[in-house]
Amino acid sequence: MSWHTGSNQDNKLFPKGKLSGSYAPLDIAFENSPAMNEFENRLCHNNPIISERSMSPAVSASYSNPEATSCGCMQTQTQPQHQTLSQHLPQTHHTDAHDQQKLSGIFYNRTTDAQNQFSETINPPPSYTVHNTDIRIPLNRQQQYPANHLGSELLEGYNNVGTEPCMGFWEILLLIILIAVLVYGIYWLYKSEK
């Protein structure tokens, strides 16, 4: 069987005639080949989140095996599938839950960030007062408006623009001009038809 990649780099990945372009079938990704082990090795070495328990045996052996090649990649070490599965099974539910909680706590525990955000020593409120009554966007707490503007209605998207009972002078003048233009346009159309 002949193989091709669409380029002259590595002629051992794709069967000729079965593929269009240089895309591999899905079973190549799960095959225990040197190319895929090298890819997984590089991925795991550059990703600090991955723990040693979740790595494949060839990659986890790279942490304990000092015989790496010159490019930093490990030689592939094949193991039977049942040994791979038994290594990945957790010993107890408690240790697995504890490790998961410890890992997620690093990235999702934001209580100290929230305390720093709402602490007045780190984020003091402004010393000036805001006299803006024409707030055109929903308020949020980071805009630091005074407390009388931080009602629940304003935080939910309510704005108080245009709540005065009568229209302003310029709005009335604009309305009169628009009505006059509309009447003149209707009159001009009526005259042009006759």
Curated annotation (Swiss-Prot):
One of its GO terms (cellular component) is virion component. Keywords: Host membrane, Membrane, Transmembrane, Transmembrane helix, Virion. Residues 77-92 have a biased composition (Polar residues). Its main location: host cell. It is found in: Host membrane; Virion. Residues 77-96 are annotated as: Disordered. It is a single-pass membrane protein. Disulfide bonds: none annotated. The chain crosses the membrane at residues 169-189. It comes from the Viruses. This is Uncharacterized protein R710. It comes from Acanthamoeba polyphaga mimivirus.
